[in-house]
Amino acid sequence: MIIKKLIPKSLKKIYHFTFAKLAAFVYGYPSRELTVVGITGTGGKSSVVYLLARLLESAGWLVGATSTVFFKIGDWEKLNNKKMTMLGRFQTQKMLRQMVRAGCKVAIIETTSQGIEQYRHLDIDYNTVVLTNLYPEHIEAHGGFANYKKAKGKLFATRPKTIIVNGDDANAEYFLNFSAKNKIKFCITDLQDLKLDWQGIHFFWNNTRFDLPLLGKFNAYNALCALTIAKSLGLSVEEIKKAAPVMQNIPGRLEFIDNGQQFKIIVDYAYEPKAMVGLYETIKMIPHQKVIHVLGATGGGRDRARRPILGQIVGEQANYAIITDEDPYDEDPREIINQVAEGALKVGKKECENFWKILDRREAIAKAISLAQKDDLILITGKGAEQAICVANEKKIPWDDRRVVRELLKNMSEEKSKYPVGSFVDLFTSEKGVRRARAHCVLQADGSVACTGDADILAALERGVSVLIDGEPHYYQPQDGIKFLLAVSAHFSNPYLFASEIQKL
């Protein structure tokens, strides 16, 4: 890394090329002993890698895979904790050699445009290369869409045996013009009688019915892509049908987190505008009340232009938006948050009313949970199953949105257990440190809270005034005071009680 930083920009390509050649030589060109499938595109790459790996494995193949989501070598696998989609040259070649030693038949490699530009694909003997789709993204890194498309094209120029392309994509013909023995197009019309609903995607493919627990049209494309690749590798439709039930539960992709709470929580990787729009199209099929969305944007100079666009999309679609830190790298995370917030403000969101800026991502998620009521839907986007937050000086902070959500839900459940039916607290509103109104609240058997005392406190609570909670145990909750108290009844049907419902004790 130190050597790389010292190399002049004009010599960087030579550096990357030389080390790519050296890495393949050191590890003995392992890809020559594998059937290598390279998956590239703007969206869906990781999902296709995951679905294909599961499908082939279920069909009895030993599989290796590398992607944003996970690494897999035969029976061994783990989530990707490197914060890199395509590993460096030596790491990639080493992993390919390990796949050979493990007896893997196929290696599936998520291959990025930036990885291609740095020659990480060099001397990998791709048997099959696949394009999921292509649309404007990572433009700042490549200096324009034309350069971005050209970078993707370099993978197809490796003269693979088979090229597989999304035929519905506007750029399909560009990639189909590259040389290959077999050229295959897949189109959404290949899925006959396609139906999308809350339970998944349902269709006929090659006169065979499939019912997959994957949500959304984009996952119909991802599944179709994986099925098409599997068939091109030699699996029969009957073998694919038998193996297909494993095509589900992609980590950090529309992943539901369920701890028994009465509202839904989805963690998703969507980090750019098109994916965000697709996510909102998909959740229309999910029964829900209000939408509470936690999001951020990536730093490090990555596509700054999309930041206010993300804020605008969420500002228009969500009832509540909470903008937080994501991966700031060397940028000021507050400035990134402000740029995203511009979009939300533009479409009428009002700070501290239906939109918040919270720097700490854990606090932002906790805020979303505190806002959620029965049948609401919380979206947490931008990181998916990523295992770290990237900050300044190339440091990585261990992180997993899903783990944090589970911890917060567990804490909420533990707080609930501290308040048996009949327990009470005294509430005091606090504005600028001055105690004002007071109420006495008792938890009822049905999960509601009965309050008596100064009714002004209830109006104050609705305004979001801080609350001092006295009783057993003692707590101070600086935000959403009554929410903290009512976490005990969050699983019941009537957790909220305001002025019109005051009961005399």
Located regions from the model:
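ATP-dependent carboxylate-amine ligase
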Residues: 2, 6-13, 225-238, 242-252, ...
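Short nucleic-acid-contacting surface segments enriched for D/E, G, S/T with interspersed K/R
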Residues: 456-468
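Structural detector for short beta-strands of small beta-barrel domains
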Residues: 418-439
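Acidic, Mg2+-coordinating active-site environments of NTP-dependent enzymes
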Residues: 32-34, 102, 126-265, 288, ...
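OB-fold/S1-family single-stranded nucleic acid-binding modules
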Residues: 478-504
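Phosphate-binding loop of NTP-binding sites
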Residues: 2-167, 172-180, 224, 230-233, ...
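Beta-strand/loop nucleic-acid-binding surfaces
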Residues: 447-458
